[in-house]
Amino acid sequence: MSRRTSAQKRSVNPDPKFNSRLASMMVARLMDSGKKSLAFRILYSAFDLIQERTGNDPLELFEQAVRNATPLVEVRARRVGGATYQVPMEVRSERGTAMALRWLVQYSRQRPGKSMAIKLANELMDAANETGSSVRKREETHKMAEANKAFAHYRY
């Protein structure tokens, strides 16, 4: 383990169009090989599609989708006397948001179809309606934590 002092948290600059830190974090997760302008284009295209289909504010729907995909508890491996236990632990808000964004991008990429903007828009709309793979992943994470509740006293 590093003996240095822990690294300073970097502040996230909000995106230029919506002035949202969450949208900026999403762009960072979408970005591939440093192509940030392409990631912005994909996100904004997805927001335009959401606006067309629902008529609602796409940023509100996006925030709702992230809230619905954010896990509250997770299991972490803890080794005790030769045995490894899956210990349920609460998730800090920043980590929960990061996990939700990662899952939204991951399951958007796995969807069938051509355009990433369309796939992302569909995943965001599904997550906002509490369906979709990213919300299912959160439910699985919660189930795992519930199943391993007996090992909660090993928390660290």
Swiss-Prot record:
Pfam families: Ribosomal_S7. One of its GO terms (molecular function) is rRNA binding. The keyword Metal-binding does not apply. GO terms for cellular component: small ribosomal subunit. PROSITE patterns: RIBOSOMAL_S7. GO terms for biological process: translation. Keywords: Ribonucleoprotein, Ribosomal protein, RNA-binding, rRNA-binding, tRNA-binding. The keyword Ribonucleoprotein applies. It comes from the Bacteria. Belongs to the universal ribosomal protein uS7 family. Part of the 30S ribosomal subunit. Contacts proteins S9 and S11. One of the primary rRNA binding proteins, it binds directly to 16S rRNA where it nucleates assembly of the head domain of the 30S subunit. Is located at the subunit interface close to the decoding center, probably blocks exit of the E-site tRNA. This is Small ribosomal subunit protein uS7.
